Swiss-Prot record:
Domain notes: The molecule is in a coiled coil structure that is formed by 2 polypeptide chains. The sequence exhibits a prominent seven-residues periodicity.
List of residues that carry Phosphoserine: 6
Gene3D superfamilies, sorted: 1.20.5.170, 1.20.5.370
Main location group: cytoplasm
Transmembrane segments: none
Organism: Rattus norvegicus (Rat)
Compartment(s) where it occurs, according to its Swiss-Prot or TrEMBL record: Cytoplasm, Cytoskeleton
Coiled-coil intervals, chain numbering: 2-248
Name of the protein in question: Tropomyosin alpha-4 chain
Residues with the N-acetylalanine modification: 2
Gene: Tpm4
Sites bearing N6-acetyllysine, chain numbering: 177, 215
Residues with Phosphothreonine modification: 216
Length: 248
């Protein structure tokens, strides 16, 4: 009779452990569903979500290992039910393993909460980046407008240079004694043309690199400043050339 009571007690413990294992599996499935939802949110994040992907992957791997351990525990529980008369010590071993699984499930819950927090933080950072991008796009448009103004000024200088070239050509027929001065003027015009081509090349380079937002804006502003200095130099050179022509 005592043996039957002991067997019944062992069976009740096995059933209790079976229920604990089922509950743990239900919780793992619930965690898996929540994790799937977090994965969908994670896929929408950009840039800063790379670190989050790794941490969620670690949580998934931990959940997979927990499910494998639960399956092993269930198998051992079935074996224990068939051999319930072996020893009470074997039951204690199973109880200890179930407790360890419970502790690991609590750790997984903490990891899941942390993953949710990281996902929310990634969403916030993405919104900040989006706002910053709007601001940079506005600055980029203004920089492009300044570049267009610089190109218009370069066109005006080119027209002035053509006029000077025409004046110099008309002076070539005046007298051979001015040939040395005319050669000097032609050399100055060539230098001015080279500077103008260099300014146009820099403007084209600025347009090709405009996609690099913040760095491009800084580069454009620097090139615009250089273009202004070159334009001032060109005006000074042209004024000097015209003055020399007037003095001939």
């Amino acid at each position: 009779m005592a043996g039957l009571n002991s067997l019944e007690a062992v069976k009740r413990k096995i059933q209790a452990l079976q229920q604990q294992a089922d509950d743990a599996e239900d919780r793992a499935q619930g965690l898996q569903r929540e994790l799937d939802g977090e994965r969908e949110r994670r896929e929408k994040a950009e840039g800063d979500a790379a670190a989050l992907n790794r941490r969620i992957q670690l949580v998934e791997e931990e959940l997979d290992r927990a499910q494998e351990r639960l399956a092993t525990a269930l198998q051992k529980l079935e074996e224990a039910e068939k051999a319930a008369d072996e020893s009470e010590r074997g039951m204690k071993v199973i109880e200890n393993r179930a407790m360890k699984d419970e502790e690991k499930m609590e750790i997984q819950e903490m990891q899941l909460k942390e993953a949710k927090h990281i996902a929310e933080e990634a969403d916030r950072k993405y919104e900040e980046v989006a706002r910053k991008l709007v601001i940079l796009e506005g600055e980029l448009e203004r920089a492009e407008e300044r570049a267009e103004v610089s190109e218009l000024k370069s066109s005006d200088l080119e027209e002035e240079l053509k006029n000077v070239t025409n004046n110099l050509k008309s002076l070539e027929a005046a007298s051979e004694k001015y040939s040395e001065k005319e050669d000097k003027y032609e050399e100055e015009i060539k230098l001015l043309s080279d500077k103008l081509k260099e300014a146009e090349t820099r403007a084209e380079f600025a347009e090709r690199t405009v996609s690099k937002l913040e760095k491009t804006i800084d580069d454009l502003e620097e090139k615009l400043a250089q273009a202004k200095e070159e334009n001032v130099g060109l005006h000074q050179t042209l004024d000097q050339t015209l003055n020399e022509l007037n003095c001939i």
